[in-house]
Amino acid sequence: MQNMKRMKANQAHKWPVPERIESLYRTMADALGPTGWWPAETTFEIMVGAVLTQNTAWSNVDRSLAALKAEDALEPHALAAMEPERLQELIRPSGFYVNKSKTVQSLSRWYVERCGAAPEGAAAISDAELRAELLGLFGIGGETADDLMLYVFSRRTFVADTYARRLFAFLGFDVPAGYPAFHKAYSPVVLSTSLSVRDLQEFHGLIDEFGKAYRDDAAKSESFLGVSLTQNGAQ
């Protein structure tokens, strides 16, 4: 019954079905190979990077992370206790450093107090509750919360970012406006696939790498997806 309702909803709104998502993942994985996402030495580095990458290039994030490492400060207890002015100085290359410093410290304190500074500390928290808690922290929006869910806490989720929006729109599917609506519409479909956490991590990386390489519809049409996927339409 649930599958029938989902199929009818997909047809009405022209959303992809789970099999289409899996086919897309396999095609992209075969063409682009392992992406290695998320690039980091520790899960906490992923957490901080997910905040710093908001509205900036990754090269700027790398500079900020390098500065934190040079201070031996890329550790949750250290960042939770650091003087805000010092943290702002270290992450200045990432831009919006005042607000980002508040977010980094809010997230660090939550991670220490709620999770014991380890991903395993959140094991007893349900997916819905964990996402709600992350969204309740200063400066954490939907995309950042889903990045953390997927890459830090190893929860199956769909990162409905700009690159995903552009890709599915190019493939002829309806894409609801705004991150919350897009995530809400596509998450049930993505989570109905057989893709594992690791697959979904890689899928997000593949989507973003594809989006960076093929920035507009003309370029996408000439890519490996242009012929093989657009011929299938919204199956």
Could you describe each region identified by the protein language model?
Residues 10-234:
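Catalytic cores of DNA base-excision repair glycosylases
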